[in-house]
A protein has these predicted regions:
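Acidic, glycine/proline-rich Ca2+-coordinating loop motifs
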Residues: 1-245
Length: 245
């Protein structure tokens, strides 16, 4: 097969002058059609609603995911989606530049997202420059937790009260199951606390032991592969599919 560039025809080129750094495809309104969210740096982010005819419409502003809770554009870097409050709807977590918090948008189901960054407990940490973001259930309790990889863009940046230096540790939030999160970075071992110039992250069970592992790619450095050795008694399921001719 071949690919044709339909960017302009589809309508996603109608937002010039933006700096998209993170993107994810998901069905935010459960209509069976994939939509697109773009985390933009220094400008409003975009939520492209699928019009079911090969075109998209940016509805980020009216949906509440274009700006921060106080109406300011943020320097979005990475993005992930999951149903963190188990209501059947995809929610959004977004990393931002240093001096700002990450963003957590809860899907209300009515076409509107509510900024729950501070209410959920993600509004206290601002020293890190976030890149990769992943919803993942790192303790297999059935609730989507959050992992963020970080690293500054300027090697000369030193560690201060406001900045965490060039090489930065990961930040992990444990989902308490009541709409709130608590930072759990230190409890997850030295691999999470090890500092690196992180730029992106992927999650998967690479050793097939039932818990999720993390791969962090770094700029001008080797990647980090963090194997999860869980001591939890919680459950997981493995499915083997068999093809039929």
């Amino acid at each position: 097969g071949t690919f044709a560039d339909v960017s302009e025809k589809s309508g996603i080129l109608k937002s010039p002058g933006t700096y998209g750094l993170g993107v994810i495809v998901f069905d935010f309104d459960n209509d069976g059609w994939p939509d697109i969210y773009v985390a933009n740096d220094s400008t409003s982010s975009a939520l492209y609603k699928n019009n079911h005819d090969g075109t998209f419409t940016d509805i980020a502003i009216e949906s509440g995911v274009a700006y921060s809770a106080d109406g300011k554009p943020q320097a979005g870097m990475g993005v992930s989606v999951a149903d963190y409050n188990a209501d059947g709807l995809f929610d959004i977590v977004k990393t931002n530049f240093a001096g700002d918090t990450s963003s957590l948008y809860r899907n209300s189901g009515s076409g509107w997202f509510e900024d729950q960054t501070f209410q959920a407990g993600l509004g206290r940490i601002t020293r890190f420059l976030g890149w990769g973001a992943s919803f993942l259930d790192f303790d297999n309790d059935g609730w989507a937790d959050i992992m963020l990889c970080n690293g500054h863009v300027y090697p000369e940046v030193g560690e201060t009260a406001a900045e965490s230096g060039y090489r930065q540790r990961k930040v992990a939030y444990r989902n308490l199951g009541d709409g709130k999160f608590i930072e759990a970075s230190e409890s997850l071992g030295p691999g999470v606390m090890e500092k690196a110039p992180g730029r992106g992250m992927a999650v998967g069970d690479f050793d097939n032991d039932g818990d999720l592992d993390i791969l962090v790619n770094c700029v001008n450095d080797v990647p980090q592969l963090l194997r999860c050795d869980s001591s939890t008694k919680n459950n997981w399921i493995k499915v083997k599919t068999v093809g039929v001719k």
